[in-house]
A protein has these predicted regions:
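Gly/Trp-centered helix-boundary motif
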Residues: 1-232, 236, 241, 367, ...
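Alpha-helical transmembrane segments of integral membrane proteins
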Residues: 202-422
């Protein structure tokens, strides 16, 4: 009994949230899947985890010279064919950190005779397996990158395995006019299943659909979280200021919000996309600036109007607390309940907005992975059912889980359940 009395309202709400199993397990699932997607470069990638390689060449270095004219070579060790270890996938994972850039692995160092400057890691893997040189390559579990264009390699990789006159995983070149002029035939290829090359097939440019669906999950959640964080930060400051000070400040602020609410959101995004190719952060900033902060501002404004009339606020003011202290230390914690319950549904809205813009061609530009971009390709040719079904399944499951989280938070944070300071 004493433990129950000593629990804070927040602890009771968290305990209540955990008791709502569908929301609690959905939160664990979303967080786990998001962490896996962030770590996808080490399990979904065309770059190896580890390369051990000795290239049978003398490594470049300083020349051996008799620097002191004493007929003694001053550098005594000869040039050796040193064994070197490389970790391309790890560098790819850390590439987002400022100051860290992905190194270029030249094909000539790995003795590949090709016109490509960078090494073909899958070909290197096959070479190391066929040669007993001690070199080895450890590829990720799924050796395809979501941005990798496989179209140029189809004539080399896809073979007529069944001797039926057709490329079994998608014919890359076709004689469309029967004039012996072979033109490039873009994929997609249908799913190969667990025993094949591409689990969920490829899209119109030869990119692996499974890799892009996983990366699309990461992009969607990251985009939605960034938008929610920015909109909440701006909305709390603006809404809190309007609700606390009121008067002319509130009048001017509400008129400003009405002006922004009247802006043609989609047309402005279309115009801006015509001038630039927005990346994830720029697109998130545009959405938040145009409309994302308005709804949160209204919520916070109303809560501040209600809370500032209560006795604890008057007590804080009478004790000499500053406006910032009263607003963000005393009022804000008591005004966050409706905002917290709104957050999961805001995330759902931003995920839908991103994929809608990508579907229309005004969102993230290829090769950025997005469910909407895959659906855009599928709608251009409905025969490509695999590009329609799998992104929809991924999006549906994700939105359902976030909805369960939102319902659980709303029930756990219901102010009617616990008494509040009056």
């Amino acid at each position: 009994m004493s433990n129950n009395l000593s629990e804070s309202i927040l602890q009771k709400r968290i305990k209540r949230f955990k008791s709502i199993k569908r929301g609690y397990y959905s939160l664990i699932a979303i967080i786990s899947l998001y962490i896996l997607s962030l770590l996808s470069p080490i399990w979904i990638n065309d770059k190896p985890l580890i390369i051990r390689y000795a290239n049978n060449q003398y490594d470049s270095g300083e020349k051996f010279e008799d620097i002191n004219n004493n007929e003694i070579w001053d550098l005594k060790e000869p040039f050796n064919d040193q064994v070197k270890y490389f970790f391309p996938a790890i560098w790819d994972l850390l590439d987002f950190i400022p100051g860290i850039s992905y190194p270029i692995y030249e094909s000539k160092y790995f003795n590949q005779t090709t016109n490509k400057f960078e090494v073909d890691f899958r070909e290197l893997d096959e070479t190391c397996e066929n040669n007993n040189s001690g070199n080895f390559v450890i590829m990720p579990i799924y050796p395809y990158h979501p941005h990798e264009d496989l179209k140029d390699e189809l004539d080399e990789i896809y073979e007529d395995l069944n001797n039926n006159g057709e490329y079994d995983a998608g014919e890359p070149f076709t004689d469309e006019n029967n004039d012996e002029v072979w033109t490039q035939n873009n994929p997609p290829t249908k799913p190969d299943g667990f025993g094949g090359r591409h689990l969920l097939g490829t899209d119109n440019t030869g990119r692996d659909v499974f890799a892009r669906v996983i990366d699309g999950f990461k992009v969607s959640i990251t985009f939605a979280v960034i938008c929610t964080f920015l909109s909440y930060s701006i909305g709390i400051i603006i809404g809190g200021t309007l609700g606390y000070f009121g008067g002319k400040v509130d009048l001017f602020g509400v008129r400003l919000m009405e002006i922004f609410s009247a802006l043609p959101f989609l047309f402005i995004v279309m115009i801006l996309s015509g001038f630039m190719q927005p990346n994830l952060f720029i697109l998130a900033s545009i959405l938040v600036f145009l409309s994302g902060w308005i709804g949160i501002s209204y919520y916070i404004r109303g809560e501040f109007y209600r809370e500032k009339a209560k006795d604890y606020v008057s007590a804080a003011v009478s004790m000499g607390a500053s406006n910032n202290s009263v607003m963000f230390k005393h009022i804000l914690p008591n005004a966050l309940t409706p905002v917290i319950t709104y957050a999961p549904f805001a995330i759902i809205g931003y995920i839908g907005t991103l994929n809608m813009l990508d579907l229309l061609g005004y969102g993230l530009q290829p090769p950025a992975a997005s469910w909407g971009e895959i659906l855009k390709q599928a709608l251009e040719n409905l025969d490509n059912w695999h590009m329609l079904i799998f992104p929809i399944i991924a999006m549906t499951i994700t939105l359902f889980m976030i909805t369960f989280i939102g319902e659980a938070i709303r029930e756990a944070f219901d102010p009617k359940v616990y008494s509040r300071l009056r």
